[in-house]
Amino acid sequence: MLAVMRFLFGTDGSPGAQIALDFLCAMPLSNADHVSVVTVPVYSFIGTGVVPEGPDLLRDRGLDAARAIGESARAALATNGVPVSLDVRNGPVVEALEMVSIQDAADVVVVGSRGLGVFTGVILGSVARALARHASMSVLVVRERRTAPQRLLLAIDGSQEAWAAVKLVSQMPLPSAAQITVLELPASPNACHWPVMDEVRVLLSAHAIEARTAEDGHLAEAILAEARAVGADLVVLGSRGMTAGSGVLQGSLADQVLSQAHCAVLVAKPPMKPRLVTDGPAIARIAIAL
C-alpha cells in the first residue's frame, strides 16, 4: 500500500529556498500526497517615505511579495500533479511554520539550509536550525543538491528516535533505485532497544540496503565520515530535541550533523501527542489554499 505523505515547504524566495523547492519537485510525489507552501511577509520601510500611507504601503508590499513567492512555488509543485495549497502567515517564522504543520498534519517540513531573507544564518539558516532543534515535527534541510536523493545514509541505534527515522524513510517518496546505507550506532545503556535491523529490512525492503557499524567515539564525526564515504545525498537520523532523547540520537548530535553535513539532512521526530491548536494574535492567518 502506497504511503501518503504531507509536506510543508517554507520559502522566502531566497536561493537556498529555491534549491529546496527543486529538491522537493524532483521527488516522485503522487496525487495522493500534499504540499503546503508557507510564506511569512517581511516588512521593510525602505521607499515608503514619511507619509500617512506608509504603514499600509509597508503591509501591502510585504503581503504582495510573500504571495508572489508562495504562488511561484505552488505553481512549480503543481506541475507534477501533486495537490498544493498556499498559506501566507504573519508572525515569527518558526512559530508560523510549526503552527501550519500541526494544523495540516504535515509529516515533514522542508526548508533550505540558508538564504538571503528570513532564513539567513552564518553557516546554517537560523530558521532551519531552530526547527531542527526545537520543533515537534520532522525537518528536511536541503543543501546544494536539486534532484531526488539516490543514496541515503540512515543512522540508527535502539531508541524511539531511531524507530521514527526508519518509519519516516519507509514512507518517503524515494526513487525506486535509491540505495540505503544503514549505520548502526553504539546504543545508549538507557535506550529502549528493539530488533533494529530486522525492522529495517522489513520496512525498507523496496530498496537495496547495506548495513555498517560505527565504532565507539565521536558519533557525529562517524556519521559525517560515513556520509562522505558512501557519497550520500541525504542523511537521516532521529532526534527528540536539544534536551531529551532515549538513545544516543539526542538533539546535540543531530545539531552537529545538520551543521556540518555536505548534503541534505532529514531530522526525524517521534510522533507527538494530540494537541488542540488555535491561531494566536502573533500568528494571524492571512490566506490559505489560494
Mark where each language-model region is:
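Short, structured interface segments
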Residues: 125-145, 263-268
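Structural alpha-helical scaffold elements that stabilize or flank donor/cofactor-binding regions
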Residues: 100-102, 131, 145, 228, ...
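Structural beta-alpha unit
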Residues: 1-3, 26, 56-60, 64, ...
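Helix-enriched interaction subdomains in cytosolic or periplasmic regions
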Residues: 2-3, 9, 103-136
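Glycine-rich, Arg-bearing micro-motifs that act as flexible, cationic patches
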Residues: 111-130, 149, 237-260, 270-276, ...
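Small/aliphatic-rich secondary-structure junction motif
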Residues: 2-54, 80, 147-213, 232-234, ...
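Aromatic/hydrophobic pocket-lining residues that form π-stacking "cages" and hydrophobic walls in ligand
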Residues: 24, 73, 97, 131, ...
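N-terminal membrane-insertion helices
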Residues: 66-70, 74, 193, 197
